[in-house]
A protein has these predicted regions:
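Acidic-and-aromatic substrate-binding clefts and catalytic sites of carbohydrate-active enzymes
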Residues: 20-22, 48-55, 123-128, 150-152
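Chitinase-like catalytic core of GlcNAc-active glycosidases
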Residues: 1-41, 50-66, 70-72, 79, ...
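Surface-exposed substrate-engagement region within the catalytic domains
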Residues: 87-172
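Hydrophobic faces of well-ordered beta-strands that scaffold small-molecule active sites
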Residues: 2-4, 42-46, 67-75, 116-120, ...
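Catalytic metal-binding/acid-base residues of hydrolase active sites
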Residues: 76-78, 124
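Outer-membrane beta-barrel translocator/channel fold
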Residues: 78-89
């Protein structure tokens, strides 16, 4: 699988004040061409900054309509209280995650696609709130992914506390 951060959190507001930069379509197209050459899955990832999951996912609709393209969302850079991305660890609520699930499920139904994979990157408990309210639908397979930093002991204990005990559907 190829992983591409299609919307990248930024330390400055940018013209739209959203503290994120959407990558040019030609770059995403290049990744899709590479994937086509090796029959690979593609994960487009979003870091919302001051934007929303809903807005960023909608901007990727033409890619997410493809059967081999899936979605990753990164709460680390979701700044709900106006902070600069990277100044602290951000958070997604179950509503944010459900926005992605609803969008992907509708695409799957509308385009008769195989289920989409939604990867939620998480390495602290506060990065996801209300995990028990995250929807489980047949069109979307939700993976809570522990992608933290630090030594092996820290990573293992973090996985046990926040991913294993709050799995939603699948863990990674």
């Amino acid at each position: 699988a190829l992983h591409y951060i299609a919307s990248t959190a930024q330390p400055s507001a940018g013209k739209d004040g959203k503290y994120r930069l959407r990558m040019p379509a030609q770059q995403i197209d290049t990744i899709l061409n590479w994937a086509g050459q090796i029959n690979a899955l593609v994960f487009v990832d979003i870091q919302v900054g001051h934007s929303t999951v809903k807005d960023e996912v909608h901007s990727l609709e033409k890619y997410l309509q493809l059967p081999n393209v899936h979605l990753g969302i990164d709460p680390e850079f979701s700044m709900k209280n106006g902070e600069v991305p990277g100044s602290k660890i951000g958070t997604f609520t179950s509503d944010d995650i459900n926005d992605a699930i609803n969008f992907l499920a509708a695409l799957v139904r509308k385009n008769n696609l195989p289920p989409k994979v939604l990867v939620v990157h998480r390495f602290t408990q506060g990065m996801v709130t209300g995990y028990e309210k995250i929807k489980k639908v047949p069109e979307v397979q939700v993976v809570m992914d522990m992608d933290g930093f630090g030594d092996k002991i820290l990573k293992r204990s973090t996985y046990q506390r926040y991913i294993y005990k709050e799995p939603v559907q699948f863990t990674g």
